[in-house]
Amino acid sequence: MIQSERKLHIEPSPDEGQFKLKIAFTTLDRQHVDQHFGTAKCVLIYGVNEHHWSLLEAIEYPVISDKTHDKLPARIADLSGCAAVYCNACGVSAIRQLLGDNINPVKVSEGVNIHLMLAEIQEELRGAPTGWLNRALKMAEKKKHDQSSDQNRLNKLMDEEW
């Protein structure tokens, strides 16, 4: 499995709990969506909610052959917790694997500005989210509810007499 070359985290780390979603963008120039998912040299991950967004992580990948398929598991693992990845193209195998990990691949035209895409996501969050965004919000809410249920069960277990 081909790992990422570098992962850069923002310090001090923004509180990821303040964001409704994490969204990834494939980019070479770090300003525009301009890469195919499978061959992207860089992925930027942002946290976003209705009122603001923040860069959380930048991931760089080594240059490898286009025919190497064992790169996908590491790339998808790097996107863990992301609701979507914006890219110019994405292969069928990658789409299947991304969807299996509840990450929506979103194809956009080459050169789309990342900050404009974040503003559009925020606008939709303030309104009535549809499509993948609506599904991602429901999934995030369910995950949060499941985690709080697990914590409640653990607290009850700890309160029991042994």
Language-model region placement:
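Non-catalytic interface/targeting segments
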Residues: 1-76, 106, 112-162
